[in-house]
């Protein structure tokens, strides 16, 4: 924030293969992380007393990679596990600073586990209940999200989400493309209300999601060659 700037660039690749009734996806990503600090930091006290703040403008970069696996059965269930910052590299630049007030940003490995299930309430594929969970940890602290959405006719949905000891939220959305003849367009809104001690200083947060998905690969048309010899 302020004098600090971050730049992350990654390339990701996933391979899908059929496994039983579903599909298993295996993926990796590799990239770089860059951190920089400007030299126009203004502090009311002496900033050189804080070894975590660079004494002058500096920047540095390092590589990073992650991996994950995801198994899903369409319109039925999914489960996934992944980890980020596997090498736990650090972004550091101690040149010409004597190691005091130098840039030293350590990345921590993060783990994610998620799972979800689609329950056809009336067995008519109209009302679908979608409970799901997401657990995140860096081996020092853990965060758990519990969600429940209900979807009608694959067009509109709504539900609640609860982040343990942190927040509770409401979610609504619609597959707006179905209403305006623009397939693949979805719109969603969410409001999170803080339940932790931060509630005294926060009235919650409001989010808007706009998503468009389309298939960029089109199945080639089958061409038939006819010859008078075989008519």
Residue ranges and their predicted role:
Residues 1-231:
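Subset of outer-membrane beta-barrel
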């Amino acid at each position: 924030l302020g004098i600090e700037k971050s730049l992350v660039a990654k390339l990701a690749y996933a391979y899908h293969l059929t496994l039983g009734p579903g599909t298993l996806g295996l993926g990796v990503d590799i990239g770089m992380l860059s951190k920089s600090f400007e030299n126009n930091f203004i502090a009311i006290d002496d900033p050189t007393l804080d070894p975590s703040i660079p004494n002058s403008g500096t920047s540095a970069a390092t590589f990073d990679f992650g991996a994950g696996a995801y198994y899903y059965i369409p319109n039925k269930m999914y489960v996934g596990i992944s980890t980020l910052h596997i090498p736990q590299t650090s972004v550091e630049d101690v040149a010409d600073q004597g190691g005091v007030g130098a840039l030293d940003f350590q990345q921590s490995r993060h783990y994610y586990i998620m799972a979800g299930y689609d329950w056809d309430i009336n067995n008519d594929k109209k009302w679908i209940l979608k409970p799901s969970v997401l657990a995140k940890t860096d081996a020092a602290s853990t965060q758990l999200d519990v969600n429940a959405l209900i979807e009608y006719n694959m067009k509109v949905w709504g539900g609640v989400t609860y982040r343990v000891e942190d927040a509770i939220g409401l979610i609504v959305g619609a597959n707006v493309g179905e209403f305006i003849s623009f397939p693949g367009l979805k719109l969603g809104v969410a409001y999170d209300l803080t339940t932790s001690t931060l509630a005294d200083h926060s009235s919650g947060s409001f989010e808007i999601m706009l998503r468009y998905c389309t298939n960029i690969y089109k199945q080639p048309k089958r061409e038939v060659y006819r010859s008078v010899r075989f008519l």
